[in-house]
């Protein structure tokens, strides 16, 4: 799938040249704040991690750790479209534009947390992102792809936040009950209400984590799972 070249990244700030040169140089605060979403109106699959690792927070970039296989897997999925190489002040915006042009988006489940190191098991006092912010910004969204188990734990809450359930239809007033008998013969009581026009159907899927901590899955096995989801939603 190839999207219009004018699809632009949606993120707040770019990392400084100093942080790009040495992402391990700056200390991190006790309370960590995540990165803004990278999405567009063309996003079909939203990839949700748990929370950026230390290297990603210092660089201000998603999946900046060189051993994370995220970008490597995406390149293997679309070999005909080279991923812009890492490094340099323009590399990350170019990578975000590349990702959006594939119909993807990226964000994390947690907006902030306390964590020593980069492991999900060390996350404490986490605050979940406000996914209602994406309602209306991603009209083509069809799937939320959870990059790992910690993210997938919140799959139900994410979907409910994205698209809250509609309230039940009001019951007929007592004085209107007699009017039910006068309805057309094909208006059968007890039939389900029609679906709301334009109401999206978004599914949640757990994908194997691209983190280097997920060493039990080979690269090829991860790639197969990721490819199946992208093909299912017409992105390959």
Locations of regions flagged by a protein language model:
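Short, hydrophobic/glycine-enriched beta-strand segments
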Residues: 40-50
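Hydrophobic packing residues within well-ordered alpha-helices of enzyme cores
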Residues: 74, 154-155
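Conserved active-site segments centered on acidic
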Residues: 46, 54-57
């Amino acid at each position: 799938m190839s999207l219009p070249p004018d699809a632009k990244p949606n993120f707040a700030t770019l990392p400084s040249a100093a942080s790009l040169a040495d992402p391990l140089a700056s200390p991190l605060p006790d309370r960590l704040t995540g990165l803004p979403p990278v999405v567009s109106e063309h996003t079909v699959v939203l990839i949700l991690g748990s929370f950026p690792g230390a290297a990603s927070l210092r660089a201000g970039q998603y999946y900046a750790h060189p051993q994370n296989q995220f970008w490597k897997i995406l390149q293997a999925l679309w070999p005909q479209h080279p991923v812009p190489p890492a490094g340099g002040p323009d590399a990350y915006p170019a990578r975000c534009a590349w990702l959006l042009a594939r119909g993807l988006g990226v964000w994390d489940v947690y907006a902030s947390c306390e964590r020593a190191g980069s492991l999900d098991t060390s996350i404490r006092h986490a605050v979940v992102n406000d996914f209602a912010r994406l309602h209306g910004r991603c009209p083509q969204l069809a799937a939320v792809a959870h990059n790992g188990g910690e993210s997938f734990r919140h799959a139900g809450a994410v979907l409910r936040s994205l698209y809250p359930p509609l309230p039940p239809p009001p019951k007929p007033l007592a004085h209107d009950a007699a009017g039910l008998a006068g309805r057309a013969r094909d208006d059968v009581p007890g039939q389900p209400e029609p679906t709301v026009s334009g109401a999206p159907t978004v599914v949640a899927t757990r994908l194997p984590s691209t983190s280097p901590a997920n060493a039990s899955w080979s690269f090829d096995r991860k790639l197969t799972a990721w490819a199946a989801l992208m093909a299912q939603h017409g992105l390959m």
